[in-house]
Amino acid sequence: LGDVYKRQLYLWLEYRASIYLWIAGIIMPAVYIFVYYDAGLYADFGINIYYLGAAIYGWMMWKYGAFLRRTILRRKGAGQKGEDTRTEEQKLELPITHMPARYLLPLTAVFIAALLGIAWILINFTDSNVPWLDSFTTALSIAGMWMLARKYVEQWWAWIAVDAVSAGLYIYKGLDFTAGLYALYTIIAIFGYFKWRKMMNKDEGLEIRD
């Protein structure tokens, strides 16, 4: 039950777009890295190293991303004009935005490469009877974590798909309680998407007033 409560806390913080979600995102994989290594679960060990790195990156991006982006734009001579009505803290923090179209192709390529690589490992080195579905959720989680770290509203699409597929996967495995949890996570992710859309529109209204 401890893991359930941690996941619910993480989802609640993510739903609210709270930067404190990254504290949980740093602590949990940091602990599991040692647990999985001692247990000899090297795939889980490896993915948690990625989650730890993504959480540290996400914290830095959410905390200082807007400042870094504004600095780059100034150097390029493409700064925005008009009165900035945000607080000093808001000027530093990364706002919720749409993912730029230029990232779609490389992110899709990373997803496909991860999907094929993980599936190959599961097929050849494990007794998994659902290697492709397992690989799909893991690969999409990798992409979703990157989108979350960049605070793109579309990250919720990834988690909706991951949670929905996971719910079906756990039903197939006979893990009804876990399937029910992931069905709940799917619903929360849908509400999270619309919550972030609303917050994004509010941020855009505050950012610049001509």
Feature-to-residue mapping (PLM):
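Hydrophobic core of alpha-helical transmembrane segments in multi-pass integral membrane proteins
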Residues: 6-9, 102-121, 186-189
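Structural signature of hydrophobic alpha-helical transmembrane segments
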Residues: 3, 44-52, 127-137
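Membrane-helix interface "capping/anchor" motifs
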Residues: 12-23, 146-158
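Alpha-helical transmembrane segments in multipass membrane proteins, preferentially the mid-helix core
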Residues: 116-128, 135-153
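Membrane-water interface of transmembrane alpha-helices
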Residues: 50-72
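Short, small-residue-biased leader/transition segments that mark boundaries at the very start
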Residues: 1-5, 163
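Short, basic, low-complexity termini and linkers enriched in Ser/Thr/Gly/Pro
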Residues: 4-5, 68-92, 96-97, 101, ...
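Loop-to-transmembrane alpha-helix initiation sites
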Residues: 44-48, 174-185
